[in-house]
């Protein structure tokens, strides 16, 4: 039995089976490349679901983490830490928002945004108590906690978890008329992924996000953009909402915000929204901790200094066009923005992901029939060409 096989056996024996990973163990990683315990090398084309946009173990981020670990790692929010203010300023200026509320995971940030929207609805908009509604979209994925599960359109995500939470409506993604019909006097917010990731890299129709912005303005409704996966350069823009030149009332960020070395998420909004929180109304012991802030400050610097959105845009266009040239009866469509690309098949994508793994390329199926390609944004054109060679070989 190999070391990898032993690790997988232990994992399957002791771990809850809430994931179905490819049969590979990763023990080392740097940049775009990872290794298993046997020394086999693989190209990472998933980036931990876009948490590693800056590449594995980016030296600037790792050094920031090490330096901070030598000083202080956690004080809780009972006291001030010396880098939280610096992080607040950096992320707020980057997003063009007044205030930030840090959490740890993407789902926590979504829950935070939903709580903010409801309290804003009652305290600012004046909706009758316990009547506020939030509109989401079919195909959405906002996390695995109870509120995101309750607003999901996937039956399997909800099975066995009832009773689900009330106060959510769902409409079809891309349908302006359906959204217009769903908005009423009790609508507090519209929650949308500018690009639906888990649904199969679904790109909204041109002008759709702008239409959401206009409807929200017309009806005094908060526009909440879940940019956890598509944001911070992944789509070829700093924020995926930038594709329609719109600014949401609320940004939700996570994943690459911590550079792939420490979990951190954030809700960003102006004072009118985040000032609804008062001491004791929301919190997190680890939210905005010194280690997370140190990693995030460095992670944001890397995104800006190395122009990762620009790299993603240029290389993503090239990669997408090359993928479109692969002639295979199983390929239904190639779509995406930046280095956030889905190859939709007429059959299950899992066998193709397994075959690509054997070729030394790691990716993951999403929504059963879509292969998601989302490499670290530091990838080179030469590395993309190598990936294309492997992809062509599998489809041949």
From Swiss-Prot:
Supply the InterPro entries for this chain: Aminotrans_3, Aminotrans_3_PPA_site, Class-III_PLP-dep_AT, Orn_aminotrans, Ornith_aminotrans_bact, PyrdxlP-dep_Trfase, PyrdxlP-dep_Trfase_major, PyrdxlP-dep_Trfase_small
Please give the catalytic activity noted in the UniProt record. Answer: a 2-oxocarboxylate + L-ornithine = L-glutamate 5-semialdehyde + an L-alpha-amino acid
GO molecular function annotation: identical protein binding; ornithine aminotransferase activity; pyridoxal phosphate binding
> Gene Ontology cellular component?
cytoplasm
Q: Which UniProt keywords apply?
A: Amino-acid biosynthesis, Aminotransferase, Cytoplasm, Proline biosynthesis, Pyridoxal phosphate, Transferase
Indicate where this protein resides in the cell: Cytoplasm
Q: Which residues carry this modification: N6-(pyridoxal phosphate)lysine?
A: 255
Q: What Pfam families does the entry give?
A: Aminotran_3
Which CDD domains is this protein grouped with?
Answer: OAT_like
Q: Which metal ions or organic cofactors does this protein require, according to UniProt? A: pyridoxal 5'-phosphate
| EC supergroup of this enzyme | transferase
Q: Which SUPFAM superfamilies does the annotation name?
A: PLP-dependent transferases
Which terms does the UniProt entry file under GO BP?
Answer: L-proline biosynthetic process
Which pathway or pathways does this protein act in? Answer: Amino-acid biosynthesis; L-proline biosynthesis; L-glutamate 5-semialdehyde from L-ornithine: step 1/1
Q: What is its EC number?
A: 2.6.1.13
Report the protein's function: Catalyzes the interconversion of ornithine to glutamate semialdehyde.
Q: Which NCBIfam families match?
A: Orn_aminotrans (TIGR01885), PRK01278.1 (NF002325), PRK04073.1 (NF003145)
Record-stated family: Belongs to the class-III pyridoxal-phosphate-dependent aminotransferase family. OAT subfamily.
Q: What is this protein called?
A: Ornithine aminotransferase 2
């Amino acid at each position: 039995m190999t070391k990898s096989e032993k690790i997988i056996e232990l994992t399957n024996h002791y771990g809850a089976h809430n994931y179905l990973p490819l049969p590979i163990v990763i023990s080392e990683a740097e940049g775009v490349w990872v290794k298993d315990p046997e020394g086999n090398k693989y190209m990472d084309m998933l980036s931990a679901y876009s948490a590693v946009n800056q590449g594995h173990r980016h030296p600037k981020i790792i050094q920031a983490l090490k330096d901070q670990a030598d000083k202080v790692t956690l004080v809780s929010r009972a006291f001030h830490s010396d880098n939280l203010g610096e992080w607040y300023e950096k992320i707020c200026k980057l997003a063009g928002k007044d205030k930030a509320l840090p959490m740890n995971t993407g789902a926590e940030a979504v829950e935070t945004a939903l709580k903010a929207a409801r309290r804003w609805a009652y305290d600012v908009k004046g909706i009758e108590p316990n009547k506020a509604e939030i509109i989401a979209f079919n195909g959405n994925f906002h996390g695995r906690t109870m509120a995101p599960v309750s607003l999901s359109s996937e039956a399997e995500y909800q099975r066995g978890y009832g009773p689900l939470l009330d106060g959510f409506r769902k409409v079809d993604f891309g349908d302006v008329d359906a959204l217009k019909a769903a908005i009423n006097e009790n609508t507090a917010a519209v929650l949308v992924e500018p690009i639906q990731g888990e649904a199969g890299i679904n790109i909204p129709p041109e002008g759709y996000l702008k239409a959401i912005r206009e409807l929200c303005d017309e009806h005094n409704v908060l526009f909440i953009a879940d940019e956890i996966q598509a944001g911070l350069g992944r789509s070829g823009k700093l924020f995926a909402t930038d594709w329609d030149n719109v600014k949401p009332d609320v940004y939700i960020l996570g994943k690459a915000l911590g550079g792939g070395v420490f979990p951190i998420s954030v809700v960003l909004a102006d004072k009118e929204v985040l000032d609804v929180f008062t001491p004791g109304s929301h919190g997190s012991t680890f939210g905005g901790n010194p280690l997370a802030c140190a990693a995030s400050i460095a992670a944001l610097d890397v995104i800006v200094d190395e122009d990762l959105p620009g790299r993603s845009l240029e290389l993503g266009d090239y990669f997408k066009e090359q993928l479109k040239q692969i002639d295979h009866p199983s390929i239904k469509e190639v779509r995406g923005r930046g280095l956030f690309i889905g190859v939709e098949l007429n059959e299950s994508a899992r066998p193709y992901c397994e075959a690509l793994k054997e070729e030394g390329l790691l990716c993951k199926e999403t929504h059963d029939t879509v292969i998601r390609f989302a490499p670290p944004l530091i990838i080179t054109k030469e590395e993309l060409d190598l990936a294309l060679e492997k992809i062509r070989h599998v489809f041949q």
